[in-house]
Every structure is written in C-alpha cells, then in structure tokens.
Amino acid sequence: MLQPQILTARQQQELNKAIIQYIKPIAEEANDGDLIQKLSESLDVPLGSIDDSVIPNYLEKKWSTVLRLQHKIIDLEGEVSNLRTVIDSQQIVPSASASVIGKDKINWLPSSSIKAFKTQSHQLVQSVSIHPALPIILGGCSDGSLIIWNLVNDESLIPEKIIKAHIRGVNTIAWSKKPVDLSGKGSEAKGIAHVMATCSSDLSIKIWDGATFKHIRTLTGHEHTISSIVFSASKPNILYSVSRDKSVKVWDLVNGYCIKTFIGHSDWVRDIDVISVNSNLLQEQSDINPELGDFLVTCSNDQSIRLSHAESGTGLSLSIGHTHVIECVKFLPFHSNYIIDKYIKENESLFPNISPEVLDDPNYTNLLGYKYCISGGRDNSVKLWLLPPPVFRPHRHPLPSQLNNSQGWLIADLVGHQSWVKSLHIHPNGRFVFSGSDDKTIKIWDLSSLNVNGRVKCVKNLIGHEGFVNDIEFASFEITNNIHASKTADDGKTKTEEDRRNELMKSIESKIRCLFISGGVDNCIRLWS
C-alpha cells in the first residue's frame, strides 16, 4: 500500500534534484558514474536540469535552516511560558492583597520612578548605593567617575560632587555596616564614621571617608578586574573582594594589607556576600558562638555558587543548577527562614532529600547565621537555595558538609525575566526579593507566596529604564543591639516563634528607610516611590 504523499509534485521534484545535486560530487570523487545515472533515472530527474534550476548546496541549506528554526521554536516556547508565568502571578494576586502590601511601612514597596538622576552620555551607570545614614545616593560610572547626589538639596538633580575615583569603570560601591575606626585606636573612639569602598576594572580598591568622601587609601593585589566587594558582618575593619583572577581576598583596612587569599572557583568570580552569627537581626540571641566569624557566598562564570568559611577559606558547599554565568548572589536574612521553612515542611513530598532534622538544625541559629541564599544569572532565572550545614570538629574550622554531597538544595525558581539577571537585593523584612535585569525591568518577588502553591510570584514589575538595569539597592539602616527578638516575655513565659517574628518586624519597621534606587546603561539613576 502506497503511503500518502506529504510533498506536492513540485516540492517532490525539487527534493529529487537536491538529492542528486548532493550525491553527484561524492559519486564523481569515487569514480562511480553509474550511481548518478541510475539515481537520475529512478527519480526521473534529467541530469542537465540540475545545475540551472537548483540553488547551490540546496539540501545542506535546507537542513541547517530546519535546525535553526527548531532552536528558535524552543526559545519562543520558553519565552511564552515565562510570559504566562508572569501574567498568571499578576492575576493571582488580588487587589485586596496588593493594598495590604503597601499598607504598612514594614511592607513598603516601590511602584513608580519619581526622579531620574542623569549622567553624561559616556557615563553608563554600573553601580549604585545609598548612604547608610544620610539621604545621599551615589553612582559608579563606566568612565571611573563617582557621582554623588543629596536628596534634600533644592537642586537635587544636580550632583553635589563628582569624583574621578578610578581610571576604569566602578563595578561596586560598598559601605561598612557600622562606623569604622581606621586609626587602630579602637572602635569606641569618638568621631569615627562609616567608610565607603569602591572597586574597579583598573585592578584597585579605594577606601573613602563616608562623611567627607576624601580618599583614604588604595588597595592593590588583584591581577584582573575586581568584580565585587563587601564589608565584614562581624569585623568593621575587614573587607572582602572577588575578581576575574578567580580569587577571594581579605583586606585589613587599618593597615591596607591583604591578609588572606584563597581560590575556590575555576573562572571569573562575579559577586560575593557575607553573613555572620554576630548579626543582631537573628531571631535567637542566646548561646551563640562568635568565634567562627564570617561566612561567604560567591558566584562565578563556572556556573557554581560556593559557600566558604572566611577565616580559613575552606569551601563548605557548592550549589549547582544554573545553566549560564551567575551574575549575583545574596544570603537571605535569618528572618526569611520562617517563610521558607514553613513551605518546605508543608510540601515534604517535593523535597524527599531534605530531612526535618536539617530544617530544624540549631547550628544554623547558634553557630552559622545563614540558611538560605538566592542567585541570579544569564539563564534569565533567580534561584532559591537551602545551604547545607557544615561539619564541626572541636578546635578546628568548619569542614565541608556531608549532606547531599556537599551541595545546596534548589528550593524554587523565580521565573519571569526575559534576559540576564544582573542584580539582586533583599527587602529589610526578608519577605520580598528585588531583581534587576537586562530586560530593562526590576521585578519584586514575594517569598510568602511559596506557601500557596510552591511558585514564587512576581508582585510588582518596575518599568522605567530604557536600557539594561545594572544595579539596584534598597536603603540599609543602622543595626543596633535593640533590634532582636528575645525568647522570653517580660512575665518569664516563652514566646512563640510567631511572637518573636512579630517583635522583630516591629523593631525593623522602626528603623527602615523607604528608599529604593536603580542604575543602568541609559545613563540614569532612578529613585522609586
């Protein structure tokens, strides 16, 4: 029985000619003229009609075109899926819920751009920052300039100061988490102030007085572009940096020396974040061991996220799941754990490799200070990870985790961006995640939506930039000893976890500053309200 024809008569004729055109040079090279003659007769194609009417290399071009179209179809299907996810998430959040989000200060979210601070045409904004105590914003530009605006000036759109900080682009601007005494006379000395640091593609880190913006000293030692810097969470005079030379360096700002270098990645290290059990934003404040110091999380072009112990440089775990370069990574604050722990416990079947003992491990609280992190990369995704606890031995630094082959557990994918995710930031309440992307948008994700259906929803989509969004920042606030949640009430009764969390949120709400900025390649820093 003959199979029905898929091609028309004309298409069949073109295919037959293309087959002979493809086979002919192969047969001639093999001195097999009879093959071509028989093929011509079988396909009813005169040999003289091929060269005139058939495009050269017709069969190969058809084949490669089909492959390209298949790849394009796959890409378009993925894009449609992402758009459906965004639309669904926006439709699922009811208006009543939206009003609750913006109702109180602790849940304040930006919604529209109210000011645009312009730079010159050759000054693409690569990094942004907000002064930790004053209404001052800063932008680091591609020409090495550091531009400073004061938000309370009458002419706030005019820069208060422009500093030629570096000879190449300013990649990161970082502030000390507490005032720093660089004189070495002790942190209790009067007159000390916050310190600012900038890093650049010119292979240098520069330290600046946070009050006067005068240059204090320059740190050198990296052999390639310095991607990111962050101040220690437990020692104000310590700075960490990562570079394209694959290394992580630890700097003592009092004397300007590099006191430690370690390499944990096989390619360009893009970003770094730090956390410590000494943080005053923990829900538990008893029985902590400050001796372990800081823990670092770094991400790289090698598509991995590495958790390290800062003092020893020991790698404790790797988180692998991104399919392209990872641009940014952040620890989640400890008060985010309540939201994510609840989701995992309510959906145990989705995480068969995560035992209840891991989720309830007291070492996260008493010794480590970290539990979850998020990452964003060039695969257009933001990923949420549970980091495994390390192994502890008496009188030794922490050792690599023995759980899950020393790898982090992927908890959720935040899907919605159409291009590279370049920057991440965490809302002070620990509930919302901000992501800036090359698709010109900033998305706000609600981690509490994990408790609904296991998918993190995008609750807001900030549109205003006309080019790639390179950096975003939510204003920090001073962390003091009274920002914590104790275990017991005044009457001696033990507080519930919910009570401690509510107390912590009230403490944060009293300090929070509702300022959010972003910077991009459209020569603009935007202030959102």
Swiss-Prot record:
* GO CC annotations, alphabetized: cytoplasm; microtubule; microtubule associated complex; spindle pole; transferase complex
Q: Which keywords accompany this UniProt record?
A: Cell cycle, Cell division, Coiled coil, Cytoplasm, Cytoskeleton, Microtubule, Mitosis, Repeat, Transport, WD repeat
Compartment(s) where it occurs, according to its Swiss-Prot or TrEMBL record: Cytoplasm, Cytoskeleton; Cytoplasm, Cytoskeleton, Spindle pole
Tell me which species this is from: Debaryomyces hansenii (strain ATCC 36239 / CBS 767 / BCRC 21394 / JCM 1990 / NBRC 0083 / IGC 2968) (Yeast)
Q: List where this protein forms a coiled coil.
A: 68-89
Judging by the UniProt lineage, the source's domain of life is Eukaryota
Each WD repeat occupies one of these ranges, namely: 120-159, 165-218, 221-261, 264-318, 321-395, 416-455, 496-529
The family database entries (InterPro entries) matched by this protein are listed as: Dynein_regulator_LIS1, G-protein_beta_WD-40_rep, LIS1_N, WD40/YVTN_repeat-like_dom_sf, WD40_repeat_CS, WD40_repeat_dom_sf, WD40_rpt
Q: What is this protein called?
A: Nuclear distribution protein PAC1
